[in-house]
Design a protein with these regions (language model features):
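NAD(P)+-binding Rossmann beta1-loop-alpha1 motif at the extreme N-terminus of oxidoreductases
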Residues: 1-49, 53
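Rossmann-fold dinucleotide-binding core
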Residues: 109-179, 183-187
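Rossmann-like NAD(P)-binding element
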Residues: 38, 49-109, 117
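A general alpha-helix detector
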Residues: 46, 145-146, 192-196, 222, ...
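A non-catalytic, amphipathic alpha-helix used as a structural packing/dimerization or gating element
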Residues: 34-45, 92, 158-169, 209-212, ...
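NAD(P)-dependent Rossmann-like dehydrogenase/reductase catalytic/cofactor-binding core
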Residues: 22-27, 168-179, 201-202, 207-280
Length: 280
């Protein structure tokens, strides 16, 4: 299968890497040339780490990289499966999807990696609604085993089968989720972040203490470490979307501390500053 990944950010390049490692031909597209360069270096670094951990051989690394084509031209994205991993704005996603629909063949499938936008709503604005589906990876995509597959009201049974087979082919655990706000994982996880922010806001504990306690309870990361990894602005966008989709239920209300971080440009690891400070 030839896979086209739209967006060379952290999520997009992870999806491209894991697809290529599974033997799929991949084209990774981004309009930003610098993002392409960063993605190339990040994938190379990830694969070198995998060699050091004896998970792959040098030959497998080389073969994986040979399967990935990088491009700044959307006209190059002529594939069997499109996976979009761009900004969480439906108008931007639909513009890209409908542009790709003019380039690709009739049997191409279109998937969104959206964290919270209803797939039925995306499909409704797309030229081929029956070919739209959600394939939601978790960060970092080349490591995290779980993938949610979300069927829109319009998605055909054939497209659902192809999507689930693709997820299985890249050695991920596939969970079929209903098209509801936040799907399964993000709906449950929202309280992980929201309550952590409330505790910080009420001066019950510092973000360092909260993260340390959560790790001590068996979690790999605390809420603030995880927000910095995902992107504070990305996490806030999901919370805002779910708050609106759940008719402004207060349990999903965005927190002012997080909003101020975003306003200041403190996005986490990617910017060098979030709830913690990082070397860029």
């Amino acid at each position: 299968m030839k896979v086209g990944v739209i967006g060379a950010g952290v999520m997009g390049r992870g999806i491209a890497q894991v697809s290529a490692m599974a033997g799929h031909s991949v084209i990774l597209f981004d309009i930003n040339h610098e993002m392409i360069e960063v993605a190339q270096k990040a994938i190379d670094s990830n694969l070198k780490k995998a060699i050091d951990l004896k998970k792959i051989t040098t030959e497998e690394k080389d073969a994986t990289q040979e399967r990935i084509q990088f491009s700044n031209s959307i006209a190059d994205v002529n594939v069997d499966l499109v996976i979009e991993a761009i900004v969480e704005k439906i108008d931007v996603k639909l513009k890209v999807f409908n542009e790709l629909a003019e380039i690709n063949k009739e049997n191409t499938i279109y998937a969104s990696n959206t964290s919270s936008i209803p797939l039925t709503q995306i499909a409704a604005g797309f030229k081929y609604p029956q070919k739209m589906i959600g394939i939601h990876f978790f960060n970092p995509a080349h490591i995290m085993k779980l993938v949610e597959v979300i069927r829109a009201e319009q998605t055909s049974a054939e497209v659902l089968d192809i999507a689930t087979n693709y997820v299985s082919s890249i050695q991920k655990r596939c969970i079929i989720a209903a098209d509801s706000p936040g799907f399964i994982v993000n709906r449950v996880a929202r309280h992980f972040y929201v309550e952590g922010l409330k505790i910080l806001e009420e001066d019950v504990a510092s973000n360092e203490t909260i993260d340390e306690l959560i790790r001590s309870a068996g979690f790999k990361m605390g809420p603030f470490e995880l927000m910095d990894l995902i992107g504070v602005e990305t996490n806030l966008s999901v919370t805002e979307s779910m708050y609106e989709l759940f008719n402004y239920d207060q349990k999903f209300r965005p927190n002012r501390i997080q909003q101020k971080k975003v306003q200041a440009g403190y996005f986490g690891r990617k910017s060098g500053q979030g709830f913690y400070t990082y070397d860029k």
